[in-house]
């Protein structure tokens, strides 16, 4: 059996954007070892796109090694292209991969049939004011939807602002639970990437980061941005954060939402 190693450290979103590579190589008959954040790559193992998940480089030979990092493939494309497209092109792989993670839903999910709101991300610079999510929650509740906030490990601050939350830290557990949610509203975060990849209609607010480069995988992704001429600017964001104007983003959300048959 041919052996392949894929190395990628980074956040959940960064890691998920390597999954189609694993899927393609699995289809070519490779036995696959991943090195990176094991909690994230466990999801790939669950869907059988990875055979072994490690946190450190093993001392052994591989028929093929894919290193995404400073001493391999640069994790960030020089041009303004979608990260996944950039990886597939560099590796000469076909643009054929699953749009949806083939993962089974948790039958006892606390999110079943509900709208999941996640006003957080890996950086406060990527979060619009939480008032935006309160407005969305009020609007959706008025239409009869049940909303619940997801509190992940980087989201402890949220608990001071909301009462209707579910706390969950394990990425694979979150993935199985999210699968049966109705739809998801979030920021440019790993959990938004996960939601989109699970096939949920996913609304994502982009301010200082680039929706072209950091688009999630999925068929029902609604990327919401005011498209200012000064965006994207991350990580050198300004104090004013005009790209996160609550009124404009809420209006934009409404337009996308009304265009959907939910």
Question: Which ranges hold each PLM region?
Answer:
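Catalytic machinery of carbohydrate-active enzymes
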Residues: 1-262
């Amino acid at each position: 059996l041919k052996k392949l190693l894929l190395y990628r450290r980074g956040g959940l979103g960064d890691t998920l954007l390597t999954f189609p590579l694993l899927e393609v190589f699995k289809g070519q008959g490779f036995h696959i070892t991943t090195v990176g954040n094991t909690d994230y790559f466990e999801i790939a193992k669950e869907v059988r796109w990875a055979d072994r998940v490690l946190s450190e480089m093993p001392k052994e030979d591989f028929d093929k090694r894919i290193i995404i990092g400073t001493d391999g493939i640069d994790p960030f494309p020089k041009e303004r292209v979608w990260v996944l497209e950039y990886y597939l092109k560099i590796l000469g792989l076909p643009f054929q991969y699953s749009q949806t993670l083939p993962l089974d839903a948790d039958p006892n999910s606390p999110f079943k049939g509900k709208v999941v709101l996640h006003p957080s991300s890996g950086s406060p610079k990527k979060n619009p004011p939480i008032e935006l999510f309160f407005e969305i929650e009020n609007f959706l509740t008025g239409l009869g939807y049940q909303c619940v906030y997801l509190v992940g490990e980087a989201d402890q601050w949220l608990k001071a602002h909301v009462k209707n939350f579910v706390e969950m830290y394990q990425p694979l557990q979150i993935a199985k639970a999210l699968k049966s949610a109705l739809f998801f509203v979030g920021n440019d975060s790993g959990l938004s990437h996960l939601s989109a990849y699970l096939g949920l209609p996913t609304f994502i607010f982009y301010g200082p980061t680039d929706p072209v480069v950091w688009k999630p995988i999925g068929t029902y992704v609604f990327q919401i941005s005011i498209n200012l001429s000064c965006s994207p600017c991350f990580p050198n964001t300004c104090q004013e954060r005009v790209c996160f104007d609550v009124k404009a983003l809420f209006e934009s959300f409404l337009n996308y939402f009304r265009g959907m048959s939910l």
